[in-house]
């Protein structure tokens, strides 16, 4: 009679019964078994792997840069970070980090940075168009200059036409890796065809202006304001 009753028990019940018996007689704590089950397939952080070649172009390493910022690398918390678009605009805008990287088309460019110190690096930059950010604010017709301000107090400017006509991007990745703090996280201007002092890092404010005589940090110290690389 017992044998017949056993055969009629649903298979799921049999599996559950066997599992409970295993728990009853094993020396492995239940907590340990649950931990193994929930962590076995979790991803392991193996660190970043940067891209070193793109469409046949050899790329420089992220580590090839030299540190020449005015106050050293800045460490910015994305929870507190805000990017402001202000000045000669119809509507001043304030973005969070996620606003910027989630709400605008993303573009990639291989661009070489040339430093006045005599070194250069060729990097695959990934980011959003500056013109998309400022056009969302509504650019005043009188605006001719875009001034960028950084978290460390640095600033520089470029012509508005340069931003628009060259599809200049504000990068948040380089060689497929999110910008590290020393490289300008959360955002760096990719000022192609300009010397490196125009490649402002740790951007916090973008101001539209009609002040074509504005001089940034190095420009006030004698560097050419156009900064065109020849």
Q: Can you say where each PLM-predicted feature lies in the sequence?
A:
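Extended, aromatic/histidine-rich regions of cofactor-dependent oxidoreductases associated
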Residues: 2-79, 83, 136-230
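Mid-length scaffold segments of soluble, non-membrane domains
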Residues: 105-158
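Stable alpha-helical elements in mature extracytoplasmic
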Residues: 81, 93-96, 126-129, 133, ...
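A glycine-rich, hydrophobic loop/mini-helix early in the fold
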Residues: 73-121
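A mature extracytoplasmic/lumenal domain signature
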Residues: 87-89, 99, 117-119, 127, ...
């Amino acid at each position: 009679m017992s044998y017949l009753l056993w055969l009629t028990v649903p298979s799921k019940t049999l599996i559950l019964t066997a599992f409970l018996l295993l728990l009853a007689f094993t020396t492995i704590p239940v907590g340990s078994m649950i931990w193994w089950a929930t962590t076995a397939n979790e991803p392991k952080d193996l660190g970043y792997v940067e891209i070193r070649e793109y469409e046949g172009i050899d790329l420089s390493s992220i580590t090839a840069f030299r540190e020449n910022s005015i106050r050293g690398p800045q460490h910015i918390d994305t929870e507190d970070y805000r990017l402001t678009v202000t000045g000669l605009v119809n509507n001043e805008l304030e973005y969070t980090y996620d606003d910027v990287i989630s709400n605008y088309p993303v573009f990639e460019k291989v661009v070489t940075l040339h430093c006045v110190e005599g070194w250069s690096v060729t990097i695959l930059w990934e980011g959003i168009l500056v013109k998309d950010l400022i056009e969302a604010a509504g650019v005043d017709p009188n605006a001719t200059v875009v001034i960028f301000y950084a978290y460390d107090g640095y600033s520089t400017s470029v012509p508005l036409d340069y931003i628009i006509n060259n599809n200049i991007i504000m990068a948040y990745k380089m060689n497929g890796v999110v910008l590290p703090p020393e490289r300008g996280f959360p955002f760096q201007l990719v000022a192609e065809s300009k010397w490196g002092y125009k490649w402002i890092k740790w951007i916090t404010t973008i101001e539209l202006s009609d002040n074509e005589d504005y001089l940034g940090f190095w420009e006030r110290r004698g560097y050419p304001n156009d900064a065109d690389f020849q």
